[in-house]
């Protein structure tokens, strides 16, 4: 279409769209947000809405699609969830008063990392991440725009950057052009992230600590610049920038957290069946977020851990007070996100009522905490700011039955503002005045069915049917004529109507102004509200951990400086919860000062992986301050956990490859210290037997001689158990079994020493493999076991058979029994007497193919 044919309105659209080429532009036109051109075509497909066109009769109609403004949020949510950006252009003036084209401007750009409003609010964090690289180290900053949380750190390598982004579950990452193409490809293709590029850095340093490194400062500034650019307003709810160090927390990669099912079950991608699910007895959205953060980042400071333990113990010892506390927390709304809505100018009357209701609960919560009469709890109590003046303002100003939208009126309480009360009185009494006029004129005119009605066009009027027109008084004046009636007005009615309309307009305008003023006053309290939110969230998580500890009979773990692990009758907390206490079989775990490696053998399904995960979860729960599932626990403080738990167990099915195994093993042996915990399950099984065994042995020796980390190494390579004679810090353990009358029972108990058998064929039997196959497997196993093979682990293995021999061996494994059975069934099904010669030849040919 030639530019000269474009209407002024469409030219305005194109001018705005030019500035937001990577976003869907929602262009407000009356009661709809319209999309045009390619945006319309693509949005119609993604949102499943109708695609029409503007100027349908033109040579080149403009594709157009639209959504109602009152339900636009649900459509925006869909686009954001799919990874797109949305720019919202609003009408900046009343169309009735506009001269020419209505002025429109983009008021916000919504991206996957900057979501504040949602039709389906989620209590989880939504982090936006920025990364900068100075050629040596990486700066990483993250922010949750919906809560104001703002943090920064620096990292040594891209592997750490990738892991941190995964741990944060970020959906959008801001970059400069300093990351390599390979690194950007990993972020986009492997991690499914939206990349946005931001070169400029925010100039206002008021939110940025001067102690930051240059690369951290750049990452944080880049993040601030992007948020201000997309949100287009001052964000008073952004919290002071917090600098953190990865080493201040128990370090775990995303793969480790996934394999341990910390925040979601890796198989189902659901919360159910995770540690988060188990420990979540929180009552507030803020508490839920903080609990997840504690699980993600267990502590390494003994002092901080013991502080949490002490408060949990106090809560455990006072059931009645703790129950009252839990019930009071149920009345606490999401202060962090309510504060952000205030800051964004989006808080509605319901939001302020929720904030007021929360503040009304705070004195009760504070009194309950004081009743525990504990010095450690008092530290929390002393920091609680009840904000009574803000609670009073909201309680006296906002009507408890106020609607969710500002435009509906009836927001401000009667008695809060004299002028507003006057206008409301006029409207209220005006209704009575109109009723009086109606009664007076009905009696004076003799028109028995005379009544006063109202519509927007004619205002208030007397409704007179045609049959009564002769009775209409002289002071009535005609306003409208209908088919069977006429509408009349009077000077008195017009005067009352004018007073009422003026009162309604003034009341609506004044009420809006009062609400805006109250919201502005609330905004001045945001910093105090955020501090209160943190304390209430902490209290919520601690009471949650106390409830879980009492419900599941957990104990308070101890810590030592001797590198000793003592767990008596420990349980895998999540498995126990799913199975039930009566079904679960506990296991003790012991590492003395001299022991660094446990080599565990035993068949699949016997409990090796559960045993390993049990130790990891016990460590994580202990170091986040929680009580743990055992009769007694004494642990060293670990600085990191490294795992490689393979795909044979259903927990992370389909994720294991030999390359991933080796990469994760490499990360462990390079990054682990003697204060780390390493859990390797069946390492080396993804390659040839001797290759796998050789790698497994070499890795064990490396950890033993150079790393010194506490390690559990599960293996099917029985030959590796002889390492205990050569490595002084390695001990063998196995999963006990009971063998009776040819049947094998897995006892799920860990015992000292190596396993004497693998029981792989028994596991195959449980899996339901054909009996003939199992019988053949027994024959092959017997033959292999009788062959003379060296079991000396350091010796060179015998030469591998030729590929043809291997193929023959693979074929002979199954034998001819099943094939013969198949041929026999085919022969028995033949009706020889009724076959034609051609059918007989065809059947013979098919039988021959079975040989």
From Swiss-Prot:
SUPFAM superfamilies in the record, alphabetically?
Answer: DNA repair protein MutS, domain I, DNA repair protein MutS, domain II, DNA repair protein MutS, domain III, P-loop containing nucleoside triphosphate hydrolases
Q: Which InterPro entries match?
A: DNA_mismatch_repair_MutS, DNA_mismatch_repair_MutS-lik_N, DNA_mismatch_repair_MutS/MSH, DNA_mismatch_repair_MutS_C, DNA_mismatch_repair_MutS_clamp, DNA_mismatch_repair_MutS_core, DNA_mismatch_repair_MutS_N, DNA_mismatch_repair_MutS_sf
Q: Which GO terms describe its molecular function?
A: ATP binding; ATP-dependent DNA damage sensor activity; damaged DNA binding; mismatched DNA binding
One annotated Gene Ontology cellular component of this protein: cytosol
Alphabetized, the UniProt keywords read: ATP-binding, DNA damage, DNA repair, DNA-binding, Nucleotide-binding
Kindly give the Gene3D superfamilies that the UniProt entry links to this protein: 1.10.1420.10, DNA repair protein MutS, domain I, MutS, connector domain, P-loop containing nucleotide triphosphate hydrolases
Q: Name one GO biological process term.
A: mismatch repair
Tell me the domain of life. Bacteria
- Tell me the residue numbers annotated for binding ATP: 602-609
Its biological purpose: This protein is involved in the repair of mismatches in DNA. It is possible that it carries out the mismatch recognition step. This protein has a weak ATPase activity.
NCBIfam families (alphabetical): mutS1 (TIGR01070), PRK05399.1 (NF003810)
Q: Which family does it belong to?
A: Belongs to the DNA mismatch repair MutS family.
Spell out the PANTHER family in the cross-references.
DNA MISMATCH REPAIR PROTEIN MSH1, MITOCHONDRIAL, DNA MISMATCH REPAIR PROTEIN MUTS FAMILY MEMBER
Query: By what name is this protein known?
Result: DNA mismatch repair protein MutS
Q: Per UniProt, what is the name of the gene that codes for the protein in this document?
A: mutS
């Amino acid at each position: 279409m030639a530019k000269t044919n474009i209407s002024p309105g469409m030219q305005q659209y194109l001018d705005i769209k030019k500035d937001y080429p990577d976003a869907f532009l929602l262009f407000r036109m009356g009661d709809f947000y319209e999309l045009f051109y390619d945006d319309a075509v693509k949005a119609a497909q993604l949102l499943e809405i109708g695609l029409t066109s503007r100027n349908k009769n033109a040579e080149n109609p403009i594709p157009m699609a639209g959504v109602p403004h009152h339900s636009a949020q649900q459509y925006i949510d869909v686009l954001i969830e799919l990874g797109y950006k949305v720019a919202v252009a609003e009408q900046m003036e009343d169309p009735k008063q506009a001269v020419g084209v209505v002025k429109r401007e983009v008021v916000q750009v919504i991206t996957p990392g900057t979501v504040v409003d949602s039709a389906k609010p989620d209590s989880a964090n939504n982090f936006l991440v920025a990364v900068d690289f100075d050629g040596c180290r990486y700066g990483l900053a993250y922010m949750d725009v919906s809560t104001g949380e703002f943090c920064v750190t620096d990292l040594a390598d891209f592997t750490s950057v990738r892991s941190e982004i995964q741990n944060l579950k970020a959906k959008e990452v801001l970059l400069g052009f300093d990351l390599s193409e390979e690194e950007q490809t990993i972020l986009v293709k492997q991690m499914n992230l939206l990349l946005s590029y931001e070169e400029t850095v925010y100039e206002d340093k008021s939110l940025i600590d001067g102690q930051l490194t240059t690369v951290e400062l750049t990452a944080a500034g880049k993040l601030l610049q992007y948020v201000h650019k997309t949100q287009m307003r001052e964000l008073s709810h952004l919290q002071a920038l917090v600098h953190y160090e990865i080493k201040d927390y128990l370090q775990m990669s995303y793969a480790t957290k996934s394999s341990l099912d910390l925040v979601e079950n890796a198989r189902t991608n659901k919360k159910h069946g995770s540690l988060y699910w188990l420990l979540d007895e929180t009552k507030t959205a803020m508490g839920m977020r903080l609990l997840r953060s504690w699980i993600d980042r267990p502590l390494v400071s003994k002092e901080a851990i013991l502080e949490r333990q002490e408060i949990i113990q106090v809560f455990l010892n006072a059931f009645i007070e703790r129950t009252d506390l839990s019930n009071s927390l149920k009345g606490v709304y999401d202060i962090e996100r309510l504060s952000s809505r205030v800051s964004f100018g989006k808080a509605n009357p319901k939001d302020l009522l929720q904030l007021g209701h929360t503040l009304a609960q705070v004195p009760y919560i504070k009194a309950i905490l004081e009743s525990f009469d504990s010095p450690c709890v008092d530290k929390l109590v002393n920091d609680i700011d009840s904000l009574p003046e803000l609670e009073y303002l909201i309680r006296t100003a906002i009507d408890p039955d106020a609607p969710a939208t500002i435009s509906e009126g009836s927001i401000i309480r009667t008695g809060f503002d004299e002028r507003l009360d006057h206008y409301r009185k006029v409207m209220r009494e005006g209704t009575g005045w109109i009723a009086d006029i109606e009664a007076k004129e009905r009696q004076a005119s003799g028109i028995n069915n005379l009544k006063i009605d109202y519509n927007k066009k004619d205002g208030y009027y007397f409704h007179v049917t045609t049959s009564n027109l002769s009775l209409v008084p002289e002071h009535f004046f005609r306003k409208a004529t209908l088919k069977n009636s006429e509408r009349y007005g009077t000077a008195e009615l017009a005067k009352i109507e004018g007073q009422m309309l003026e009162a309604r307009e003034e009341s609506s305008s004044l009420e809006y102004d009062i609400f805006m003023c109250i919201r502005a006053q609330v905004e001045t309290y945001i910093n105090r509200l955020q501090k209160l939110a943190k304390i209430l969230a902490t209290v919520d998580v601690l009471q949650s951990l106390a409830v879980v500890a009492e419900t599941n009979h957990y104990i308070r773990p101890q810590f030592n400086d001797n590198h000793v692990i003592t767990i008596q009758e420990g349980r895998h907390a999540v498995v126990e919860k799913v199975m039930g206490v009566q079904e679960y079989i506990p296991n003790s775990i012991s590492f003395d000062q001299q022991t660094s490696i446990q080599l565990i053998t035993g068949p699949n399904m016997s409990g090796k992986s559960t045993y390993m995960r049990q130790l990891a979860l016990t460590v994580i729960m202990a170091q986040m301050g929680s009580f743990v599932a055992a009769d007694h626990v004494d642990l060293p403080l670990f600085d990191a956990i490294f795992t490689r738990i393979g795909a044979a167990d259903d927990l992370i099915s389909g994720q294991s490859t030999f390359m991933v195994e080796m990469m994760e093993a490499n990360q462990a042996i390079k990054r682990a210290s003697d204060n780390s915990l390493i859990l390797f399950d069946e390492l080396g099984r993804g390659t040839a037997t001797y290759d796998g065994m050789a790698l497994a042995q070499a890795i064990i020796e490396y950890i033993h001689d150079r790393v010194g980390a506490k390690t559990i190494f599960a293996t099917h390579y029985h030959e590796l158990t002889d390492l205990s004679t050569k490595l002084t810090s390695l001990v063998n353990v196995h999963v006990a079994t009971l063998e009776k009358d040819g049947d094998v029972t897995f006892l799920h108990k860990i015992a000292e020493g190596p396993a004497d058998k693998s029981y792989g064929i028994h596991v195959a039997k449980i899996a339901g493999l054909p009996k003939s196959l199992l019988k053949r497997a027994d024959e092959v196993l017997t033959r292999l076991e009788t062959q003379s093979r060296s079991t000396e682990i350091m010796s060179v293995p015998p030469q591998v058979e030729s590929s043809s021999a291997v193929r023959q061996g693979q074929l002979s494994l199954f034998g001819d029994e099943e094939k013969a059975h198949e041929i026999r069934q085919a022969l028995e099904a033949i009706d020889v007497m009724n076959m034609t010669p051609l059918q007989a030849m065809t059947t013979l040919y098919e039988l021959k193919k079975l040989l």
